[in-house]
Amino acid sequence: MFFGMDKRTLYIIMAVLVIMSLGRYLGNTSALLSLVLTLPAVLIAITFHEFAHAFAADKLGDDTPRRQGRLTLNPLAHLDPVGSIMLVFAGFGWGKPVEINPRNFNRTVTMSKGEAIVSIAGPLMNFILAIIFTIINFAIIRFAPQFILSQIGIIILTLLQTTIIINVGLGVFNLIPLPPLDGSKVLSHFLSYKAKEWMMNNQFILTIAVFVIVFYTNIMGYISSYIMGGMIWVVDWIFGLFL
């Protein structure tokens, strides 16, 4: 079960959403180029996201991810086919979940707190990557204005900006408090047993509601835009201080 749905149902829904997204690329060269540049951005975002989960669990004393080969930056260890396709076409998605055993956590944290730390590590890594690539983007624009007018410069700048967007999108999407997304485990740490039980019992309905809201209100886009706007403002302010 995933998002309260069996795999067949999930795949059908994902296929419909992808087909709906394909229209924008037909006969549109710039859109196709953007799609191609999205692929390395997806690899970076998912790989570092899942590695962050594995790294956090390992540091807390759980060697499960290490034994399963997840403590690596090899993309093949972390990619989920459906989640990766969604990230390419829809701007949000997920990687292969990192399995952990909270009972292995050291005594510095409770199992619930440890799960929350491991869960938040993934989205946090995406936001850190987004900031790093924003700084690189600003540096190129500031110090190499002629370079960005060249064909290779335009491609590199587009790749950087796509990587920023994908990382912010992946981070925001995974903070949605619905199982099995990271946000559910973070929120779970602060909820009562009754509240957790209610969420699990209504998981399917909540999932459908979230997908409808995400696709018909563009709320993910609004949240991501505010986050990216904030990052740009901070990076611009930092550059203004020193340059």
Model-derived regions, located:
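Hydrophobic transmembrane alpha-helices and their immediate loop junctions
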Residues: 1-243
